[in-house]
Regions:
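Catalytic core of soluble alpha/beta enzymes
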Residues: 215
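Conserved N-terminal alpha-helix of the aminotransferase class I/II PLP-enzyme fold
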Residues: 1-166, 170, 174-177, 190-204, ...
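Short glycine/proline-enriched coil/turn segments at helix->beta-strand junctions
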Residues: 206-207, 229
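Short amphipathic alpha-helix with an adjacent loop that forms part of the alpha/beta core around
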Residues: 218-229
């Protein structure tokens, strides 16, 4: 394990361990103190959430999310109407009573990669506030480094997201914002996707999901396009 609170190395050495992980059996999960951030909340993220909850007098289900916009989207999807959304520096704490909505809300947070990062939590716990000028300089440097690896893409056109699934969810939402007013609400899934990508389409309430299992079946896609209601084609 790297000597860092942000490091993640997890071994599930036996099939029984894998089954215990998937079934969330306590005997397995008591040994898992770190993991892929969307599936296992980093200890620093949990500490930041607890500290903010104490500050605002909140309890129940606690979700430290990257932005108010992300919080509003997920609250609407999960039909949570009794939540508090408290600003905490450059992120927000969403809290609401434990209940039937807790698990679906948590799942959609997972699908969208909207939790704050462990480094963001660490900065908050250390009392380091976000500096907009420093953030802008850091983003400029990241874009400059990435630009040579992305053909014909200007640095200003590179959008940096919180995480991989966060980028996917944001991209789908952006396309929907453009296509929905045009009456285009059908998404074609071409081939099998990573599970969270699939769930974004399956759980959407304002779009239709069409699954073409064979990634080479371009003919199936071409037969759907003339209908004029396709918002996009998604494949991985």
């Amino acid at each position: 394990m790297p000597a860092s609170p942000h490091g993640t190395v997890v071994s599930l050495p036996t099939l029984a361990d894998v089954e215990g992980y998937e079934r969330r059996e306590p005997a397995t999960w008591k040994h898992i103190t770190a993991g892929y951030p969307r599936f296992v909340r980093n200890a620093l993220v949990s500490q930041a959430a607890q500290q903010a909850a104490q500050q605002f007098g909140r309890s129940g289900s606690l979700f430290p999310l990257a932005s108010r916009r992300a919080a509003d989207r997920i609250l609407a999807w999960a039909h949570v109407t009794d939540a508090h959304v408290d600003p905490v520096g450059d992120w927000v704490l969403v809290s609401f009573p434990e209940g039937p909505a807790s698990e679906p809300f948590a799942k959609f947070v997972q699908h969208t990669g909207a939790l704050i990062s462990s480094r963001q939590a660490e900065a908050h716990l250390a009392g380091r506030s976000a500096d907009s000028a420093e953030t802008a300089r850091a983003l400029e440097q990241v874009r400059a480094v990435l630009s040579p690896y992305l053909a014909s893409v200007k640095p200003a056109d590179i959008l940096v997201a919180l995480a991989g699934m966060n980028a996917v969810a944001a991209g789908i939402a952006a396309v929907n914002d453009v296509q929905r007013p045009r009456g285009k609400r059908v998404w074609i899934q071409l081939g099998w996707l990573y599970v969270d990508s699939t769930r974004l389409f399956e759980k959407a309430t304002d779009t239709q999901h069409v699954f073409v299992p064979d990634v080479t079946d371009i003919g199936a896609v071409e037969r759907l396009l003339p209908q004029g209601d396709v918002a996009g084609v998604f494949t991985e």
